[in-house]
Amino acid sequence: MARTVNCVYLNKEADGLDFQLYPGDLGKRIFDNISKEAWGLWQKKQTMLINEKKLNMMNVDDRKFLEEQMTSFLFEGKDVEIEGFVPEKDQD
């Protein structure tokens, strides 16, 4: 049986992550409160952010910026702003 969590991003019970994907206390918080579905949504946003802003994951400041964006997205309900991006459903 799949592990379920009360996902704070989706605001519902959903399948939880299989294991902790992020280190430290934030990783534990994500594991306990974020579903696979919500994590997948974050991964898409994360990829877009890394590409559009040309982030270097070897750079401490870039990693800190990405972590702040992740926390805002997953726990505060703030969408990631990517300059020039228009979601498909809004396009003509």
Curated annotation (Swiss-Prot):
Keyword Iron: yes
Domain of life: Bacteria
Gene3D superfamilies: Fe(II) trafficking protein YggX
InterPro entries associated with the record: Fe_traffick_prot_YggX (IPR007457), Fe_traffick_prot_YggX_sf (IPR036766)
Cellular component GO terms held in the UniProt record: cytosol
Keywords associated with the record: Iron
Gene Ontology biological process terms, A to Z: cellular response to oxidative stress
Gene Ontology terms for molecular function: iron ion binding
Entry function: Could be a mediator in iron transactions between iron acquisition and iron-requiring processes, such as synthesis and/or repair of Fe-S clusters in biosynthetic enzymes.
Family (UniProt): Belongs to the Fe(2+)-trafficking protein family.
Protein's UniProt name: Probable Fe(2+)-trafficking protein
Organism: Shewanella sp. (strain W3-18-1)
